């Protein structure tokens, strides 16, 4: 499965810790991330990450394009609710597209862990049927 990972600046360390904790599960899938987040994940996990541009340079738009083409199966976007809203339209577009195309989406650690555990148990295999 193709997993999109994004983290606001204040959540990047949390994303690193999350990917360290679930490295074994994530290593069985393709990981896509915005530029800085992807680089930070690679540094601590040695996972291969397909990196988009940095989020503020269009990385979230690149992810959105893959969602529109049904090429992403799950998105974890660790958002900082206190973050400036400078690229909020891009964030809202990703949320809208995930809702439109029935792509599981998490914005916090609790939901992210539920999605990764579901992934581990095969509960998201229905995504493969949709892609055909």
Model-derived features: where do they sit?
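Mid-chain, well-packed structural core segment of small domains
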Residues: 60-100
């Amino acid at each position: 499965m193709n997993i999109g990972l994004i983290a606001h600046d204040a959540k990047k360390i949390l994303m690193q810790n999350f990917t360290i904790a679930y490295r074994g599960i994530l290593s069985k899938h393709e990981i896509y991330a915005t530029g800085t987040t992807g680089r930070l994940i690679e540094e601590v996990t040695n996972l291969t990450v397909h990196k988009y541009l940095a989020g503020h340079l269009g990385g979230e738009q690149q992810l959105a394009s893959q969602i529109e083409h049904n090429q992403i199966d799950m998105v974890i976007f660790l958002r900082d609710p206190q973050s400036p809203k400078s690229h909020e339209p891009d964030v809202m577009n990703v949320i809208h597209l995930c809702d439109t195309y029935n792509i599981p989406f998490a914005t916090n650690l609790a939901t992210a862990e539920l999605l990764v555990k579901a992934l581990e148990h095969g509960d998201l295999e229905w995504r493969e049927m949709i892609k055909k």
